[in-house]
């Protein structure tokens, strides 16, 4: 109805028109075309902290001290000041106090989370929005050794003496509960080894190949729900131990009935030793691995109707690669819903290195209720890619925060889908393109910003320089432009990290990070060099 697109026209349209069902949030987000962070305060006087992110509801700004010992939480506010200038044509200059960090943020508290030999993992943070709980992690130094102190540990996976997960109430900074993992390895970078779905928490132990499922109670306690790995059901261990004891007692009664000459033979063949120490010499596969092999076997068996062809197919596709399947370890895991997990399998080398592009990988869907594998794909499977292209939002778990449900993806945004198809058509090898796209699966939990300024139906920007993904990027001296989608030639605002006049030293490599508030026209850009001198903090807001 109104094509001008100014704020007055949009407000009037909102008064007289009702948006279609389910489109009220999208209609409201159109206001952000007019409310943009168009003003920048450069090199703001700020505390020397590592600023992590805004929470999903925008109530808190999470930061850590430079020594990675303390958590500092801020409450975003807004710049307020008065002026005696009666001019209506030009904006009055901001007072000097406006160039300070505490004009925009109020410190709520500071809490020491790490002991003397531990450090806070600055790349890890999960937010439970319903109760305003924050999950943090501390750890000791990583030990790079291939020796395994336990027979259950995977050789080649490094060890961390102590990993502590701390559940904290962000309203007042009270520590509610802790969970400690000793001599283990959990990938904490960018929340890769931990996934939060509603009140369920999944923690993947790479070293011991266990998925620890915990429940966050309303009281703030972490309660063990299940551990998936060697055992799949709660009573598996009890059943196996009772069966083992029955077998041992039966074998012992048989041995006692033998003659003295035969007792010496049984003492030499090692049978008793293997039964008395089942854990030390146990060659059984884990419960998850057995279910995976069983699913692969049945899938290959059902491909053919003739028994002769079935045997030939099993020899070629199953038995020939049997050891390769056995050697697979769990790399990453995410919830699809409260009953299903998406598990990524791969080699040991790919699980501990940062770049797993060249390592073979597989995806499995695991039903926690039936303890069965219900689907299995290779990382070059076209059918899995088709699901990923058409239903990407089903892989990114919905959140109770309304802002998180509108993060742009190629399954909910026509512009993102066009960009994906352009990249697909440009690719020389479709198989390599599929592998590259499926690298993002399983998705890291809470790894994208819900800010409307990353909505590609509203703004167009260079995704090589900035995006909704929670990652550091190489800094550029040129400002990042946000251009209107509705008016393709209209520049809405610019974001420039670093000093206003640029840096004199162009040789030093600079990285930057961007923290966008989920619903306010407010953003923080932090620029620093690789050698970590004091950061340059800019605040971008609407005047």
UniProtKB/Swiss-Prot annotation:
One GO process term, biological-process aspect: red, far-red light phototransduction
SUPFAM superfamilies attached to this UniProt entry: Six-hairpin glycosidases
Domain of life according to the entry: Eukaryota
Compartment(s): Nucleus, Nucleoplasm
One of the Pfam families matching this protein, by short name: Det1
Extent of Polar residues compositional bias: 246-260, 274-283
Region (Disordered) location: 246-283
Major location (coarse): nucleus
Motif (Nuclear localization signal): 421-436, 492-510
InterPro entries: 6-hairpin_glycosidase_sf, De-etiolated_protein_1_Det1
GO annotations of cellular component type: nucleoplasm; nucleus
Keywords: Nucleus, Phytochrome signaling pathway, Ubl conjugation pathway
Record family assignment: Belongs to the DET1 family.
Quaternary organization: Component of the CDD complex, at least composed of COP10, DET1 and DDB1A. Interacts with DDB1A. Interacts with non-acetylated N-terminal tail of histone H2B in a nucleosome context.
Reported function: Component of light signal transduction machinery. Involved in repression of photomorphogenesis in darkness by participating in the CDD complex, a complex probably required to regulate the activity of ubiquitin conjugating enzymes (E2s). Involved in repression of deetiolation in the developing seedling. Repression of photomorphogenesis is probably mediated by ubiquitination and subsequent degradation of photomorphogenesis-promoting factors such as HY5, HYH and LAF1. Involved in the repression of blue light responsive promoter in chloroplasts. May be required to stabilize the CDD complex.
Protein name: Light-mediated development protein DET1
């Amino acid at each position: 109805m109104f094509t001008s697109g100014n704020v007055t026209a949009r407000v009037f349209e909102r008064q007289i028109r009702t948006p279609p069902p389910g489109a009220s949030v999208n209609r409201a987000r159109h206001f952000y075309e007019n409310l943009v962070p168009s003003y920048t305060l450069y090199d703001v006087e700020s505390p020397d902290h590592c600023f992590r992110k805004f929470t999903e509801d925008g109530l808190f700004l999470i930061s850590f001290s430079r020594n990675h010992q303390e958590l500092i939480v801020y409450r975003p506010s807004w710049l307020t000041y008065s002026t005696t200038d009666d001019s209506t044509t030009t904006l009055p200059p901001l007072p000097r106090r406006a160039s300070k960090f505490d004009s925009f943020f109020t410190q709520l508290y500071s809490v020491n989370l790490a002991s003397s030999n531990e450090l806070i993992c600055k790349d890890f943070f999960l937010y439970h929005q319903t109760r305003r709980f924050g999950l943090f992690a501390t750890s000791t130094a990583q030990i790079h050794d291939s020796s395994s102190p336990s027979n259950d540990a995977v050789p080649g996976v490094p060890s961390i003496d102590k990993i502590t997960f701390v559940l904290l109430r962000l309203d007042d900074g009270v520590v509610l509960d802790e969970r400690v993992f000793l001599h283990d390895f959990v990938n904490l970078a960018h929340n890769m080894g931990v996934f939060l779905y509603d009140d369920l928490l999944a923690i993947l132990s790479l070293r011991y190949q266990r998925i620890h499922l915990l429940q966050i109670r309303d009281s703030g306690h972490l309660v063990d729900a299940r551990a998936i790995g060697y055992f799949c059901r709660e009573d598996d261990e009890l059943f196996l131990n009772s069966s083992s004891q029955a077998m041992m007692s039966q074998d012992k009664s048989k041995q006692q009935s033998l003659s003295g000459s035969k007792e010496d033979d049984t003492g030499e063949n090692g049978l008793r030793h293997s039964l008395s120490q089942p854990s030390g010499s146990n060659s059984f596969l884990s419960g998850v691995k057995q279910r995976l092999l069983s699913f692969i076997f049945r899938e290959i068996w059902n491909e053919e109707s003739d028994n002769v062809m079935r045997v030939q197919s099993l020899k070629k596709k199953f038995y020939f690669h049997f050891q390769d399947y056995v050697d697979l370890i769990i790399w990453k895991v995410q919830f699809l819903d409260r009953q299903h997990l998406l598990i990524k399998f791969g080699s040991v080398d790919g699980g501990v290195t940062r770049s797993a592009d060249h390592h073979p990988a597989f995806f499995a869907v695991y039903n926690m209720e039936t303890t069965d594998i219900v689907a299995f794909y290779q990382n070059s499977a076209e059918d899995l890619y088709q699901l990923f292209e058409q239903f990407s939002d089903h892989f990114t778990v919905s959140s109770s925060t309304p802002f998180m449900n509108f993060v742009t993806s190629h399954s909910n945004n026509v512009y993102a889908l066009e960009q994906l198809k352009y990249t697909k058509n440009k690719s020389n090898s479709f198989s390599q393109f599929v592998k590259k796209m499926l690298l993002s699966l399983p998705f890291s939990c809470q790894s994208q910003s819900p800010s409307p300024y990353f909505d590609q139906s509203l703004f167009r920007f260079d995704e090589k320089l900035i995006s909704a993904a929670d990652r550091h990027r190489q800094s550029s001296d040129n400002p990042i432009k946000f251009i209107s989608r509705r008016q393709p030639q209209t520049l809405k605002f610019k974001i420039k990290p670093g000093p206003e006049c640029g840096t004199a030293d162009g040789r030093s490599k600079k990285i930057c990070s961007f923290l966008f508030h989920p619903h306010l026209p407010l953003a923080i850009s932090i620029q620093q060099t690789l050698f970590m001198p004091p950061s340059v903090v800019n605040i971008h807001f609407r005047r």
